[in-house]
Design a protein with these regions (language model features):
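N-terminal nicking endonuclease/strand-transfer module with a His-rich metal-binding environment
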Residues: 1-192
Length: 192
């Protein structure tokens, strides 16, 4: 893309839940990193959600609704079950924190985040981008909890409920404008 500086891209830093920290210099081909992040997310989903998928597909077959069957790629691409991305940036385009300060603040925040919410929210990967106008971090996580069958499944609202988050307006029904994600996002901003 036009806004990416290939020389500065060499300073990008990457982390994922299976391999830990990496840099753009290893592996030397930056395209491998995108594939690797996709692979990391697929591997996490296969490890954690295959039993749910297989059992749900069996239940669908028993009631003759195999058209409802899903696969790991379906979970990864569905708006309701795919990893969620958060972008962290300190400051503006003209006045922003250094990459070192951003990395320090966000890694400390992610550690607190995992300690507090890690039972139901899993940080899969993140990337510190130095190759654009301002340093920023793309972080991806997934929400999950046990369903009524005792299977761990990706489900944001139920995971947040299990973590004790309330609706912003408990007197109103769950809706697009009244959901636990709103309360969770506010708690994360306060924690950061």
């Amino acid at each position: 893309s036009e806004h990416i500086d290939p020389e500065r891209a060499k300073g990008n830093i990457y982390w994922d839940c299976f391999h830990g920290f990496r840099s753009a210099l290893a592996p030397p081909d930056p395209d491998d990193l995108a594939t690797t992040f996709s692979d990391v997310e697929r591997q996490f989903y296969e490890t954690h959600y295959t039993a749910f998928i297989e059992n749900q597909n069996e239940r669908n077959a028993k009631i003759r609704h195999t058209e409802r069957n899903r696969s790991i790629p379906d979970l990864l691409s569905s708006r309701k079950t795919c990893p969620e991305e958060t972008i962290y940036q300190l400051g503006t385009l003209d006045e922003h924190a250094s990459a070192e300060d951003l990395l320090s603040v966000v890694t400390e925040f992610i550690e607190k985040f995992k300690a507090k919410y890690g039972e139901h929210i899993h940080v899969l990967d993140w990337a510190l981008h130095l190759d654009e106008s301002t340093p920023h971090i793309h972080e991806r996580h997934v929400f999950d909890c046990e369903n009524k069958y005792g299977e761990v499944a990706p489900q944001q609202e139920k995971a947040l409920e299990a973590l004790g988050f309330d609706l912003p307006d408990p007197d109103k029904p769950l809706s697009r404008r009244n959901n636990r994600k709103i309360t969770f996002d506010a708690a994360c901003r306060k924690m950061l």
